[in-house]
């Protein structure tokens, strides 16, 4: 199987509400370009321990603000504690190394459970996510403790804390000082020592992966750290691979849900359709089943 013309290195973390809110952009790219783009997940690991300076009420306030801003299914009820993300990130890296075809499903299930109120450092949450993602629960738990998994996880973390020169040049919104505390996953970036930076979530490194057409000189790499509108990614892809074809917009919300194969939020369906949320909500109500979470919820075909 030949490589796709474009590779996107996706730096993210299952605990980050900004990354969760940006899933609509990623889904739109998947719809438009499909297998013309390859994706690599890299875990940032926003937190390794429970942050003492970021209490649950502060997390609840941040979740509420983002849920109202972007309409994603985020339950902002106050948690009993702020859960560090390292165990979930380790489980994702373990999945990548042994069951790479289930990595995206595992990330999705961890996000859905986390933003519905579950705790990412709880063994029950990790087991439920693994089961829902079609993974062997006990085997994954044992494999996650392997030295190979820990080494790969630390490699991800080093990469996330070594932003490119191009990303540093854009350091007005996509980088942070690298201290792994939860507050830095939910508030806009701040300034810090130049030598101490890390990617916020999501951050994309987009690379030309195959030789460009002889008569079409293209860019070789475009880095877009931090939360961006989908148009920024489309422009980068056009510069990297102008020969890519774009799939027409979907004809219906049913087409989107059938294509996705997983329950989607209203905002995600709207983004794939290139419409506003009120424009798709009525059609979704007539065509799909709904599971409420926070200010929105998830739609699926019956």
PLM features: what roles do these ranges have?
Residues 1, 9, 32, 194-197:
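Generic structural signal for beta-strand residues in well-ordered domains
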Residues 2-28, 42:
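Local sequence-structure signature of Cys/Sec-based thiol-disulfide redox active-site neighborhoods
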Residues 3, 34-36, 287:
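Short, well-ordered coil/turn elements that cap or connect secondary structure elements
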Residues 5, 88, 198-201:
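A structure-centric signal for secondary-structure junctions around beta-strands
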Residues 17, 48, 213:
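Flexible, glycine-rich phosphate/dinucleotide-binding loops
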Residues 21-128, 266-269:
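Structural alpha/beta surface segment adjacent to cysteine/selenocysteine redox centers
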Residues 23-30, 112-301:
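C-terminal cap of thioredoxin/glutaredoxin-like
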């Amino acid at each position: 199987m030949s490589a796709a013309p474009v590779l996107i290195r996706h730096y993210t973390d299952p605990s980050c509400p900004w990354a969760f809110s940006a899933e609509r952009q990623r889904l739109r790219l998947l719809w438009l370009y499909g297998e013309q783009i390859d994706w690599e997940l890299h875990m940032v690991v926003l937190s390794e321990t429970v942050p003492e300076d970021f209490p649950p009420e502060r997390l609840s306030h941040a979740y509420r603000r983002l849920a109202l801003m972007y309409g994603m299914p985020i339950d902002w009820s106050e948690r009993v504690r702020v859960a560090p993300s390292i165990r979930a990130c380790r489980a994702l890296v373990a999945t990548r190394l042994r069951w790479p075809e289930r990595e995206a499903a595992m990330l999705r299930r961890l996000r859905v459970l986390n933003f519905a109120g579950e705790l990412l450092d709880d063994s029950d949450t990790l087991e439920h996510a693994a089961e829902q993602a079609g993974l062997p629960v006990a085997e994954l738990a044992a494999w996650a403790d392997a030295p190979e998994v820990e080494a790969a996880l630390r490699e991800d973390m080093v990469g996330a804390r070594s932003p490119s020169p191009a990303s540093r040049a854009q350091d007005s919104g996509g980088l942070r000082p690298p201290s792994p505390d939860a507050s830095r996953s939910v508030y806009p970036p701040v300034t810090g020592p130049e030598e101490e930076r890390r990617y916020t979530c999501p951050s994309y490194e987009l690379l030309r992966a195959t030789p460009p057409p002889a008569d079409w000189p293209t860019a070789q790499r475009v880095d877009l750290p931090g939360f961006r509108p989908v148009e920024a990614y489309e422009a980068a892809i056009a510069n990297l691979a102008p020969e890519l074809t774009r799939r027409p917009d979907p004809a219906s919300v049913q087409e989107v849900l059938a294509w996705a194969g997983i329950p989607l939020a209203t905002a995600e369906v709207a983004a794939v359709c290139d419409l506003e949320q009120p424009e798709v909500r009525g059609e979704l109500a007539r065509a799909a089943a709904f599971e409420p979470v926070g200010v929105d919820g998830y739609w699926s075909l019956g």
